[in-house]
Swiss-Prot record:
GO cellular component, one term: cytoplasm
EC number(s) from the headed UniProt entry: 2.3.1.274
Enzymatic class: transferase
Function statement: Catalyzes the reversible formation of acyl-phosphate (acyl-PO(4)) from acyl-[acyl-carrier-protein] (acyl-ACP). This enzyme utilizes acyl-ACP as fatty acyl donor, but not acyl-CoA.
The species this protein was found in: Clostridium botulinum (strain ATCC 19397 / Type A)
Key words, A-Z: Cytoplasm, Lipid biosynthesis, Lipid metabolism, Phospholipid biosynthesis, Phospholipid metabolism, Transferase
GO molecular function, one term: phosphate:acyl-[acyl carrier protein] acyltransferase activity
Record-linked Pfam families: FA_synthesis
Name of the protein in its database record: Phosphate acyltransferase
Main localization, broad class: cytoplasm
Pathway: Lipid metabolism; phospholipid metabolism
HAMAP family according to UniProt: PlsX
Family the entry assigns: Belongs to the PlsX family.
Length: 335
């Protein structure tokens, strides 16, 4: 399997991108990586780490898409950017997956306009996995589509279901519709229409769920439009970050707290690991005609390595073909 990695995307590019790629080719069998970006910079990082293997190559790209550029314009105008070059490798069949920690908006535009959508899929959705009390959960969509139709949400649910079943090995994952109340009649026109459609599918649909129920692990796939999904995601990240800061402050405020904190250090370490985004790799753009993984902007080497592992599993489990097959089932049932 060949994986295209945007070597210039993210806060720590290209240093930690290269480090993550080296770790991945050493750990995972059957992968070859093409790093796109400024050749001299990437080669210097490989040389620093004394890598002289044949599982990593460089494709030169002189331009970089920054996070403050208009996404669609950047993808269309910066043809010699590291992100576009990586996407084009997948489009041309020279790679089977693309990974970038660069601009989320630009990668979304690239997934749509460079890779294209799977035939029959209305919108590509961003579907991150997050740690829950019982097990990881997915938000679909987490910001790619702020305005949606009910049938889009059904497709998001289907693609999330495929990911859980194929990639994570979870049979019959639960699907919940994010809403302001659990009752069927709650919500706006979008959620009411989506509820009716989801109820008619063969998904394990448990009905409406309130945002507070999501981190409890009450559902595997939380379905919503991108505006709601991104709000839930950012709130969740903010609460988790502040929780650790507040806890640390309280522990350090007294001698008793410091002693208790020292005794509970292994527990806190394990607890913090559950909230470590690097464990999850990245967020897949589901519905694109190619495997596309968005790594966190501040990804370290471990996060890149795990994003590469994630892309490999998606490829091995034939996630694109599985989405196509499941889409056919929806169409047959007029949904």
């Amino acid at each position: 399997m060949i994986i295209a990695v945007d070597g210039m995307g993210g806060d720590f590019a290209p240093e930690l991108v290269v480090e993550g790629c080296i770790q991945a080719v050493k750990e995972y069998e059957g992968i070859h990586i093409i790093i796109t970006g400024k050749k001299e910079l990437i080669k210097n990082e490989l040389d620093k780490r004394e890598y002289n293997g044949n599982k990593i190559e460089i494709l030169n790209a002189e331009e970089v898409i920054s996070t403050n550029e208009a996404p669609v314009k950047a993808i269309r105008r910066k043809k010699d950017s590291s992100m576009v070059k990586a996407l084009e490798l997948v489009k041309e069949g020279k790679a089977q997956a693309v990974i970038s920690a660069g601009s989320t908006g630009a990668l979304m535009a690239g997934a749509t306009f460079v890779l294209g959508r799977i035939k029959g899929i209305n919108r590509v959705c961003l579907a991150p996995l997050l740690p829950g009390a019982k097990a990881p959960f997915m938000i679909a969509d987490a910001g790619a589509n702020v305005d949606c139709k009910a049938e889009y949400l059904v497709q998001f649910a289907m693609m999330g279901k495929v990911y859980f079943e194929s990639v994570l090995g979870v049979k019959s994952p639960t699907v919940g519709l994010v809403n302001i109340g659990a009752e069927e009649e709650k919500g706006n026109e979008l959620t009411k229409a989506a509820y009716k459609l989801l109820k008619d599918t063969d998904f394990n649909f448990i009905g409406n769920i309130e945002p507070r129920d999501i981190p409890r692990g009450e559902v595997n796939i939380a379905v919503c439009d991108g505006f709601i999904g991104n709000t839930v995601l950012k709130t969740y990240e903010g609460v988790a970050s502040n929780l650790f800061s507040m806890l640390k402050k309280e522990i350090m405020a007294s001698t008793r707290g410091k002693i208790g904190g020292a005794l509970l250090k292994p527990v806190f370490k394990d607890f913090k690991k559950k909230f470590d985004y690097t464990e999850y790799g990245g967020s897949p753009f589901l519905g694109a005609k190619g495997i596309c993984i968005k790594a966190h902007g501040s990804s370290d080497a471990k996060a890149f390595k795990n994003a590469i592992r994630q892309a490999k599993i998606c490829y091995d489990k034939k996630i694109i073909e599985e989405i196509e097959n499941n889409l056919g089932n929806l169409i047959e049932n007029n949904i």
